[in-house]
């Protein structure tokens, strides 16, 4: 049986919101329109708009209301544009935004490592017993001049411990990793109720300045190869064994 893939970010978000335990980790995410953009900016001040379907951080745009409400700006790729009014901001966004379904998501103030933003990828797979297991957690450090952390968009793969060492001690890191593993498994269980043929997921998790984790989105075709960069080679080897068991056609070298 083929592994189930779910393209729509919003569809997956709606499933997570049905869980009382998980909804507190999901930032507000709604369909992008002129009206929702304005109301979300008024409420949160900083947002990300992104395609409902897509990978590698392509098409993600950061939108902000400037301090004292003196204007707006957005960043797409490495380009930053500033506007004096909401109308001109929206016009500018429509000129650069691909004409397909977009979402608007509450912006999270990410933790930084050497002045660069980072987030985490939590890999979750069905193990050899058919149970969900968090098999790896790795950090992704953003390119200095970009807003996304994806490796394919210039991000740097970095161990969790390296990124978090200046924010918490070793004992706190161990507890935090366990918390992320639990969130990963809970997310997989919740999604598999609606999508029973899922076998693997990758959670993109932001950590805010209060150290709260946020599930930015869930990828149902996660890239395991980034974990080959970890010094503990057993992590990737376990991922490969699990993938071979639930999908012999899923070649993970």
Regions found by a protein language model. Name each.
Residues 96-108, 144-206:
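A long amphipathic alpha-helix within ATP-dependent nucleotide-binding catalytic cores
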Residues 26-28, 47-88:
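Glycine-rich phosphate-binding loop of ATP-grasp-fold ATP-dependent ligases
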Residues 47, 133, 214-216:
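Protein kinase-like catalytic core scaffold
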Residues 1-59:
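A conserved helix-loop-beta module that forms one wall/lid of the active-site cleft
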